[in-house]
Structures are given as structure tokens and as C-alpha cells.
Regions:
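Interface amphipathic segments
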Residues: 1-254
Length: 254
């Protein structure tokens, strides 16, 4: 393999497949870069559509609806050494060895179960360490949880123990987000709330039992508030921030 500056040489890449059959297919790839196994009843287009069908739930505004494909498959990938791939195709990306991706898809209930575990990923000087992501979704609901031990952003911001859990039911998303930010002082953030697609092709957000601190000062949000976002901007209703014996009430358009 060659890019504009250098040549790269691979060790043996072993590919085993019976993909000409109509069902019970498998493809197995072994190399010094990664190992990959896909098996079941599938085509590459159906694998793409299985992910697209579920991810469209989170951003379906103005896009063509994708139907759940008829397929049943599982997949496993182990990253060994991505140095050559990164240097040739995406120099800004680095994936640590022993990163694992696995999952399965079933036609029944359009069930997608997806897991990602990685010691670390770096992209454009943004670094994530010890990543554990789980995604479980059916036609009725979806749940995502991820836990990142440490994040260092290109702007110098450092984040410890970033944890997110959310569940999507119909057009309503419920989320619980926690992290600790290290700058000149430490700030702990705890956000609990919801997001709902509105009939006006926008989103309604609300915070519940949410708080954060800046140094020794603690701040809290009221439970009854509304933030509406659409193409026309942002509308805020009854958002109150309490702290240090004072409060700030926000109402209006941004």
C-alpha cells in the first residue's frame, strides 16, 4: 500500500468466507491489523441498514425513513495494530490495540445489541481512555450507556469519570449524565432530564434534579423548566439556577 509519501507492507491477511450462499453466511478475517468475524443471514447493505434504522431514532428530522432490514447476524472485531491504517487513511485517528466491537441483530423486534470496549481512542488530539459503551435497541425502545474513565480535549479541558445513561421510548429520551471537569478548579456535574421531539419539528428539553459545583460553591436547577430548540433558535421557559443564596430566572428567546 502506498500514499503520497511512503510505502507500507502488510503481513499475511487471511480471509475465509462462504458469502455466496443465501443464508448462514460467514466471513472471517485474520491479520496483524485486526480480526473480524461476521456470521448469519446478511448482506453488507442490510448490515448498514440495521445500524441506520436504529440511529435514525436520534436524528430523523428531514431525513428519509429507513425500514428495518430482514436479517439475522452477529459480528466481532478485535483491533490489533491500527498504525498503518491511521497513517494512510486517517492520520488524526488512533485506536489502541485490544479495542473490541461486538454485537448482534435479529429480525424479530428489529433487535440490535452492540458493545464497544477500548483502552483508548484519540482523534485530532482529543483523547478518551478506558471506554465502555453498550447499546441495546428494539423497535419500541433504545438504551445507551457509556463510561469513560478519562478524557483530555484538544482545548486543554480534562474530564474524569464521564458517565452517560439514556433511554429512548417513542419520541421521548430520558438521560442521566455525570462527569468531573478539571481546570484551575474541579467541577462535578450531575444532569438528569429528558428530551422530546415536538410537533413543530424541534426538540423540547427539561432538567430534573440537576446540579453542579464550581470550587466550593454548589448550584442547582429547578425541576420545572423547558428549553425548546428548532431552526428558529432557542426558547427558554422558567429555567431557574440557585446558588450561594441567590437565584437567576431565565425566560425568553436566544
Amino acid at each position: 500500500m502506498r500514499n503520497s509519501k511512503d510505502s507500507y507492507f502488510f503481513e499475511d491477511i487471511v480471509v475465509e468466507s462462504n458469502s455466496f450462499q443465501d443464508s448462514n453466511k460467514y466471513i472471517n478475517v485474520e491479520s496483524n491489523i485486526l480480526d473480524l468475524e461476521i456470521k448469519g443471514e446478511y448482506t453488507l447493505a442490510k448490515i448498514r441498514d440495521a445500524f441506520a434504522f436504529h440511529f435514525q431514532k436520534y436524528n430523523s428530522l428531514g431525513t428519509k425513513e429507513i425500514m428495518a432490514p430482514v436479517a439475522d447476524f452477529s459480528f466481532d472485531m478485535l483491533v490489533k495494530d491500527m498504525k498503518v491504517i491511521s497513517e494512510v487513511f486517517i492520520p488524526e485517528l488512533w485506536v489502541e490495540p485490544n479495542s473490541k466491537i461486538s454485537g448482534r441483530y435479529f429480525t424479530d423486534l428489529a433487535l440490535l445489541d452492540f458493545n464497544l470496549n477500548s483502552p483508548g481512542i484519540e482523534y485530532k488530539q482529543n483523547i478518551l481512555e478506558a471506554i465502555d459503551l453498550k447499546y441495546f435497541s428494539s423497535e419500541q425502545s433504545s438504551k445507551i450507556t457509556f463510561d469513560i474513565f478519562y478524557a483530555s480535549l484538544a482545548n486543554g479541558l480534562q474530564i474524569d469519570s464521564l458517565i452517560l445513561a439514556n433511554q429512548l421510548r417513542g419520541d421521548s429520551l430520558f438521560f442521566d449524565f455525570n462527569c468531573a471537569i478539571r481546570d484551575s478548579i474541579r467541577s462535578d456535574i450531575d444532569l438528569l432530564g429528558y428530551a422530546v421531539k415536538s410537533p413543530e419539528q424541534g426538540y423540547n428539553f427539561g432538567l430534573r434534579e440537576s446540579s453542579f459545583n464550581i470550587g466550593e460553591e454548589d448550584f442547582f436547577f429547578n425541576d420545572k423548566n423547558l428549553i425548546h430548540i428548532d431552526t428558529g433558535g432557542v426558547y427558554i421557559e422558567d429555567l431557574i439556577l440557585y446558588g450561594d443564596g441567590e437565584k437567576i430566572l431565565v425566560n425568553g428567546n436566544i
